[in-house]
Structure formats: structure tokens, C-alpha cells
A protein has these predicted regions:
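C-terminal target-recognition/interaction regions appended to catalytic cores
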Residues: 1-161
Length: 161
């Protein structure tokens, strides 16, 4: 399903600031037990368990949802670890102290980093041919894949009917 690292646009590679900030990737993917306040002033205890982060490549994938597109941190977007190219490391500064902090928190190797899935990878994950949605923007492509039925499942149902 995954494309080679050199084919991953820089915009899909996560930056350390987005990972470490107060409501960033690490916070959103993690477990929470906290007090929250509703718009009417009512306070309540909010709790949720962690989401595997980064996504495990040796297990079945989570469902692609319509909010998969865009670069903003989200609990629901797929994030995978990968080995960036030397060019990506240099352009994005993936060797600074904040990147080392992220690697330490997430048990990443020295040459590993994190990225979101590209539109082609989302298409592959859902069983569509590469570039099935290429005429749309990347955000719309992700939305389409989040709104799609997995082709293999539909094909099997059709064959049984």
C-alpha cells in the first residue's frame, strides 16, 4: 500500500511542532482522563483510550474516515513511520532537538520519522486503482476515500448475489 519515501510530498511529513504542541498529534492520539466544560458551563469527566500511534503496519488498518485529508493534527488520521530520504531530512530539518524528543517519546529509531498517508495510499487501502481520484484536490481525494466502501468487500458481495 505504501509508496516509496521519495514519492511522499514534504507536506505529508509531520513537523515536530505539530507533534509536540498542547493539542497536537501526540495528545490527540493518546489516552485522556480530564475534566471538560460544555458550552453551558456544565463540567464533566472526559475519558478515552489511546489510538495506536503511529499506525501499525503489521495489522489490519483502521477505517479511513472523511476527515482524513488536511495537515492539521487529528485522532482519526492515519500516521505511519517511515525512513525519510536524505533530501527530506535536510529540507525539513528532521535532526533537531525537538525531533529527537519526538523520537524518544514514540520510540522511533534515529532514522525514522512520521507522515500521513497520501491520496494514492488511501486509494490502495480501499482497494481502488492508483490515481482513481486524481482530478480532485488532495483534501477531496481523502474525503472521497473516507466516504467509500472498500472495493474488495463490495466485489465479494456482488459475486455472492
Amino acid at each position: 500500500v505504501l509508496v516509496t519515501p521519495g514519492k511522499v510530498p514534504d507536506s505529508y511529513i509531520l513537523d515536530s511542532e505539530a507533534l509536540l504542541r498542547e493539542k497536537g498529534w501526540i495528545y490527540l492520539k493518546g489516552s485522556k482522563k480530564e475534566m471538560r466544560e460544555g458550552t453551558d458551563g456544565f463540567t464533566y469527566r472526559y475519558a478515552e483510550g489511546p489510538v495506536t500511534f503511529p499506525d501499525a503496519l503489521n495489522r489490519a488498518s483502521r477505517t479511513v474516515v472523511t476527515g482524513e485529508g488536511g495537515s492539521s493534527p487529528s485522532r482519526f488520521k492515519h500516521v505511519v513511520k517511515f525512513k525519510p530520504t536524505k533530501g527530506q531530512v535536510g529540507r525539513l530539518g528532521l535532526t533537531d532537538a525537538k525531533c529527537d524528543e519526538v523520537r524518544s517519546k514514540l520510540n522511533l529509531g534515529k532514522t525514522q520519522w512520521l507522515r500521513r498517508l497520501t491520496p494514492v495510499e488511501l486509494e490502495r487501502l480501499n482497494g481502488f486503482p492508483d490515481n482513481h481520484t486524481e482530478l480532485a484536490t488532495d483534501g477531496r481525494r481523502a474525503f472521497f476515500m473516507g466516504n467509500a466502501l472498500v472495493c474488495g468487500v463490495v466485489s465479494r458481495i456482488a459475486n455472492e448475489l
